[in-house]
């Protein structure tokens, strides 16, 4: 399976189950080039169906190996698939309903889905997909970049290109955030990437400080954070001896890079190892330990492979992740699927 095949298998799930959805972000080169997460907006009924039906993709060669909640209504998945060369490929759908940042609601999903547009790919056997209207894409993408306080040249170019598709509609959408409107329009019209990048921190403060967090949202976000602690999505592998760790490190990290948010190498003698391992696992980090740890740190080890073959170790890690994800989230255990 290629990443293109994996993408259209995922899109087929939405189409087959009649989930209303729209992709967010620069999809100009989809499905041939997908170099980041696949960001998706849906409504609450659609999200419930997605959580239930995504497990059926295993019959098509896509395995759920990760799932975690990173906002009140946002869930990050990792789907693993075997590529034609025998290696592992990954597709990372990041799906949400209303757009929240730090438990503050910024955008409603339903109006955006009402205005979505069809993007056809006539040269692709998979067909097309749904994407946001240019005005919604402009505002959503801008708010994401402001929230992360990060904007690359390619991302700024995407904002400008989307703005040019419907300038009036983009201005109207941006008017919902008066503290952003004039400044952002000026940066875009003047092609001032440096100015917008420098203003991101200030713009973020103006967006978030002008809105309060309702108590129910604060409670839901606290529950989410507690869940991340008690259901960590990181993984710790012990290499059998220092030489194995040095040999495995680049190859194993390359094989598993798409399955985790971060990667790290630790030595078993590292000061404060237990605390560091726990923090790494909560942050969805793949950790390779050069030696077997002692004390409480041993409790955080997920795999101590007996073999030396990197591909076998990578497959064992993905098998363990798949089992863990099913145990935590798959509704088949409750007779739903």
Where are these regions (language model features)?
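Short phosphate-binding/catalytic loops that engage adenosine nucleotides
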Residues: 19, 260-261
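Structural motif
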Residues: 45, 96, 239-244, 266-270, ...
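Conserved nucleotide-sensing/catalytic segment adjacent to the nucleotide-binding pocket
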Residues: 261-302
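A generic structural signal for well-ordered alpha-helical segments
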Residues: 14, 256-257
């Amino acid at each position: 399976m290629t990443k293109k095949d994996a993408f259209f298998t995922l899109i087929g799930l939405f189409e087959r189950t009649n989930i209303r959805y729209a992709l967010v972000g620069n999809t100009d080169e989809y499905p041939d080039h997908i170099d980041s997460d696949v960001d998706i907006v849906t409504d609450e009924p659609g999200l419930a169906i997605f959580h239930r039906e995504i497990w059926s993709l295993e019959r098509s060669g896509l395995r759920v190996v990760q799932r975690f909640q990173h906002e009140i209504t946002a869930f990050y998945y990792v789907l693993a698939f075997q590529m034609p060369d025998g290696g592992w490929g990954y597709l990372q759908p990041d799906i949400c309903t209303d757009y929240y940042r730090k438990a503050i609601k910024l955008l409603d999903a339903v109006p955006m889905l009402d205005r979505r547009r069809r993007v056809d790919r006539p040269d692709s056997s998979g067909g097309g997909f749904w994407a946001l209207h240019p005005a919604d894409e402009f505002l959503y993408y801008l708010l994401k970049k402001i929230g992360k306080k990060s904007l690359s040249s390619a991302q700024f170019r995407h904002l400008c290109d989307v703005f040019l598709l419907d300038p009036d509609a983009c201005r109207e959408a941006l008017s919902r955030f008066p503290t952003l409107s004039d400044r952002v329009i000026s940066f875009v019209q003047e092609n001032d990437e440096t100015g917008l990048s420098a203003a991101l921190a200030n713009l973020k403060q103006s967006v978030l400080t002008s809105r309060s967090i309702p108590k129910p949202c604060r409670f839901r976000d606290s529950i989410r954070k507690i869940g991340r602690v008690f259901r960590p999505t990181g993984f710790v592998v012990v290499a059998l001896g220092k030489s194995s760790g040095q040999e495995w490190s680049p190859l194993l990290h390359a094989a598993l890079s798409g399955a985790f948010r971060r990667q790290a190498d630790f030595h078993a003698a590292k000061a404060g190892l237990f605390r560091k391992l726990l923090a790494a696992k909560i942050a969805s980090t793949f950790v390779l330990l050069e030696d077997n740890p002692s004390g409480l740190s041993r409790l955080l080890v997920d795999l101590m492979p007996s073999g030396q073959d990197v591909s076998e170790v990578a497959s064992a890690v993905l098998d363990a992740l798949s089992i863990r994800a099913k145990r935590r989230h798959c509704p088949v255990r409750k007779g739903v699927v």
